[in-house]
């Protein structure tokens, strides 16, 4: 009997595809976790940052959601690149910014829609106050300031007058405490990385450790979340939070979820 044309070839082709797939999975499992997660962070950052959100209606709330999300994925990209280059221990400033952005997006998403615009304006008012302080300090030091105070004053804000909201805007700890979700893990990582992101005594001791109370050695600060496991989970929370805010603000579902879909297509 003449065999059915192509059947053996098809089985062979399927077998080969299965073997190649298993080989890729074995190779993936053989790689260190920090490299696997760094590669994922790079792919997902590229995917999210490439999403065209120009059709999202312009509003302060939408700007905060999209802007913070993009900033977080830019930091994620830098952290991943330096981690792959064996410089992960030096990324504390980037990690600190990343954790803070994650907290802020989760906090912002947890605010009632009716209060979200006032919260955004409270953030803007706090930023304006900080810029004014910077302007004053520069003038007192005899340094020319290019901060246009008059232009900032012309910007009308409807900031929340609630003391609790103002404190949450100024103090990240208060924002964490006010968020319904338990942000304890992200907050702990932010606090830890804050130690290594500033000119602290601990940072000096890590880079120039004492050896036997006689000589000064060479060292590095600890690499928090070395394998980027918490980082990977945080990127999920970030992109989902941004999408939820946009959807809650009435952005069409396809557009509101575009970044989330781009992110999960990299899984």
Language-model features: locations:
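A cross-kingdom marker of C-terminal helix-rich interaction/assembly modules
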Residues: 2-267
């Amino acid at each position: 009997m003449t065999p059915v044309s192509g059947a053996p070839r098809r089985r062979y082709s399927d077998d080969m595809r299965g073997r190649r797939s298993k080989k890729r999975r074995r190779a993936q499992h053989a790689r260190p976790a920090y490299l696997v997660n760094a590669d994922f962070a790079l792919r997902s950052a590229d995917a999210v940052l490439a999403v065209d959100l120009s059709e999202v209606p312009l509003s302060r709330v939408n700007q905060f959601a999209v802007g913070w999300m993009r900033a977080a994925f830019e930091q994620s990209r830098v952290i991943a690149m330096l981690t792959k280059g064996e410089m992960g221990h030096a990324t504390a400033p980037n990690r600190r910014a990343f954790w803070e952005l994650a907290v802020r997006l989760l906090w912002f998403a947890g605010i009632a829609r009716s209060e979200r615009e006032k919260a955004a304006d409270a953030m803007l008012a706090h930023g304006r106050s900080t810029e004014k302080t910077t302007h004053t300090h520069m003038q007192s030091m005899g340094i020319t300031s290019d901060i246009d105070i008059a232009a900032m004053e012309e910007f009308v804000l409807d900031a929340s007058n609630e003391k609790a909201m103002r404190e949450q805007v100024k103090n990240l700890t208060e924002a964490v405490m006010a968020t319904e979700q338990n942000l304890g893990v992200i907050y702990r990582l932010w606090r830890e990385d804050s130690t290594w992101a500033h000119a602290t005594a601990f940072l000096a001791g890590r880079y120039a450790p004492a050896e036997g109370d006689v000589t000064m050695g060479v060292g590095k600060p600890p690499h928090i979340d070395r394998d980027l496991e918490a980082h990977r989970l945080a990127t999920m929370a970030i992109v989902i939070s941004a999408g939820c805010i946009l959807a809650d603000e009435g952005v069409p579902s396809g557009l509101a979820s575009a970044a989330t879909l781009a992110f999960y297509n990299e899984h």
